[in-house]
A protein has these predicted regions:
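Nucleotide-sugar donor phosphate/pyrophosphate-binding loop at the beta->alpha transition
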Residues: 117-118, 143, 154, 163-185
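Glycosyltransferase donor-sugar binding loop
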Residues: 64-71, 216, 237, 241, ...
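Carbohydrate-associated surface elements
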Residues: 195, 215
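Aromatic "clamp/platform" in nucleotide-sugar-dependent glycosyltransferases that forms part
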Residues: 294, 313
Length: 404
């Protein structure tokens, strides 16, 4: 096991002088983020954890740890938390495109070395703060989990991703061993979907897990009306990458056109637009596809659409799926990952197999030709979106952490 003997020796010397974590009015929770700025669902979820702790336990001293200063840290200050900037090295990394197999040969030794200062710094922080609990956000940052284990502090790990299947990460210690270590370093592993939970349990059936769905409270909309003769407009929001499914969406639009049905597609997100524009041109649907960069305000884009899309190959949860539903849009999604936990086929949207452009096109053409069906699914989508409210999330989190 990673540095096992060394950790046991340190543990015997540093276990807070055999004193328990602080109880009562001076209780402290340390929450660790893997990022410093907004730009993904993980940062939003981290902020929601901070808000939950402050809302439900105002007397709790909450310390938020970030790898560096950024707008996430600045935003969380308003909730009355302390900010700590600390070295939070990762044990999972994106594969090098030009040589994806080189990591095991060159990466293990230097990556292992950079973990040690992070663990040492975390131990010193916990010795000073004497926290009641520690929470790590996302599966990629182990330092504070290891430090909490060394010092006998209850640690909870929030796993919001599959890691390997969705982000194609390379894990320093291997994927299976990493998941098992997450289990051993945590009192409870908090997953953001049952799909993620099942993926973790498949690798370590002894892992103690629970599921808490994220908060989604974007503005509620009214299901948009589509006038006779008006083209169906669909929208996909997310970082431009193969795993997020923009290419699948464009291919489905081409399939629909070949079947004699023109459907307009809007893509919104960060990343390179050029490959998507070239694909649309090659498939003869450039006139139907519009591509936009990232924006903090999607209200206008939602309002202009009739149907939302979730085309990811393996989405852990899919915050934008719920955002589209809250805007009054039925969602056509892939039957993979956590998406089927949100989209119920024929109730609030339609499902097709991951990577199946023909299947997605068929679902879109069904909604294009059946406006009453689309409207009924839109109503179901709005109702479904009510499941992801803040009070539900906060109550579940506080109960799991034993802070009620």
């Amino acid at each position: 096991m990673f540095a096992g003997d060394a950790l046991r020796r340190v543990s015997s010397r540093l276990r807070l002088n055999n004193s328990p974590p602080v109880e009562g009015p001076d209780r402290c929770a340390v929450v660790i983020s893997n990022v410093s700025s907004f730009g993904g669902g993980g940062a939003v979820d981290f902020r929601d954890v901070i808000r939950a702790l402050r809302r439900k336990q105002p007397a709790l001293n909450v310390v938020a740890v970030y790898p560096q200063k950024g707008d996430l840290a600045a935003d969380c200050v308003q909730y009355g938390v302390q900010t700590q900037i600390a070295w939070t090295p990762w044990w999972a990394f994106g594969k090098w495109r030009f040589a994806p197999g080189v990591h095991p040969l060159l990466g293990a030794l230097p990556y292992s070395a950079i973990l040690l200062p992070g663990i040492a710094q975390a131990v010193l922080l916990f010795l000073r703060l004497r926290p009641t609990i520690v929470l790590s956000n996302t599966m990629v940052i182990p330092s504070h989990a290891i430090a909490a284990k060394v010092l006998g502090i209850p640690h909870y790990w929030q796993v919001r991703e599959f890691g390997r299947d969705d982000h194609q990460l390379w894990f320093l210690l291997g994927y299976r061993r990493t998941v098992r270590l997450i289990s051993r370093l945590s009192k409870t592993v908090i997953c953001n979907s049952h799909a993620v939970e099942q993926a973790m349990l498949a690798l370590d059936p002894t892992m103690k897990t629970t599921v808490i769905y994220p908060v989604v409270e974007t503005p509620l909309g009214t299901p948009p009306k589509r006038q006779p003769g008006e083209p169906l407009r669909v929208i996909l929001v997310g970082y431009f990458s193969k795993s997020k499914g923009q290419q699948l969406a464009i291919n489905s639009i081409a399939c629909a056109r070949h079947a004699g049905v023109d459907i307009e597609l809007t893509l919104v997100g960060a990343g390179s637009q050029r490959p998507l524009r070239k694909l649309a041109q090659r498939l003869g649907v450039a006139d139907l596809v519009s591509i936009h960069g990232p924006t903090p305000d999607l209200v206008g884009h939602w309002a202009a659409a009739h149907v939302g899309l979730m085309c990811s190959e393996c989405e852990a949860f899919g915050r934008v799926t719920v955002e589209a539903m809250r805007a009054g849009l039925p969602v056509c999604g892939t039957r993979s990952g956590g998406t089927p936990e949100i989209i119920e086929h024929g109730v609030n949207g339609l499902l097709s197999l991951a990577g199946d452009a023909q299947g997605l096109a068929g679902n879109l053409m069904s909604l294009e030709s059946d406006e009453p069906l689309r409207r009924a699914l839109a109503t179901g989508a709005l109702k479904t979106s009510e499941r992801f409210q803040r009070d539900r999330h906060d109550d579940e989190l506080i109960t799991i952490l034993g802070l009620h």
